[in-house]
């Protein structure tokens, strides 16, 4: 189970605050036990300030890299498919898919209304561009089965062909990395990653590496629009400091574990309440 801590709202704004918190939690897709908190004080701007103890280094947030910023990956980059509320696989960039009887071929039918945050269209050509980059950067070995090739069937259909059955592919595509999608404008003239360009609900507005990242809604997002104007992620390593920030109203949400002895303090604070939700964990064995 994972735990959440949130402030009780004042002045009749409880429902509005709950919606803000629920949206941020959904975006974060936290995959481990954690405590969260939400500030009661209403702000003129619709801003949520969240804290994490992991390194915030968006300059390294290349979707094919295994950086620590998995929450940024979830907010900026979309997968072909994603986990639903009950652990079932749901459409994302792919609106539907077909699996061959032998489990070696997956055909994905892409949405036709998707654009990246810079306005670039997402389509089969973009999937092929990303696939070629996976090959060049030697990340296709992350699939549980050997990927033989990817083929463009038409402008919005792609086919993944494996050497043997890959029954876990949909689960693997739901992971934050390394198989999410960016576009050519994310790379500099030397082919090196230089900026975060994705199809997700959020895009980076500004950041101070190792300190904070400010995200704003992606104006080209194809799905439901967020009902907040800005998310500020702050890197706060010390657990006690995160608790104090929640109590003072400096921060709204804690996305990391806090000291166990602080749980009673949170429970005793009338401006804080706790929530529980089922978390998803993936276990795997690898051979040397």
Could you describe each region identified by the protein language model?
Residues 1-47, 61, 88, 149:
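Short, low-complexity disordered leader/linker segments with a strong preference
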Residues 51-101, 132, 197:
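N-terminal lobe/hinge region of extracytoplasmic solute-binding protein
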Residues 84, 88, 174-226, 230:
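Gly/Pro-rich hinge or "lid" segments in bacterial periplasmic/extracellular proteins
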Residues 95-137, 159:
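Aromatic- and charge-enriched surface segment that lines or borders ligand/interaction sites
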Residues 98, 102, 142-185:
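Surface-exposed binding/hinge segments that line
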Residues 144, 263-276:
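Ligand-binding "clamshell"
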Residues 216-221, 279-288:
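A bilobed periplasmic-binding-protein/Venus flytrap-type ligand-binding module shared by bacterial periplasmic
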Residues 219-264:
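Ligand-site clamp/hinge motif
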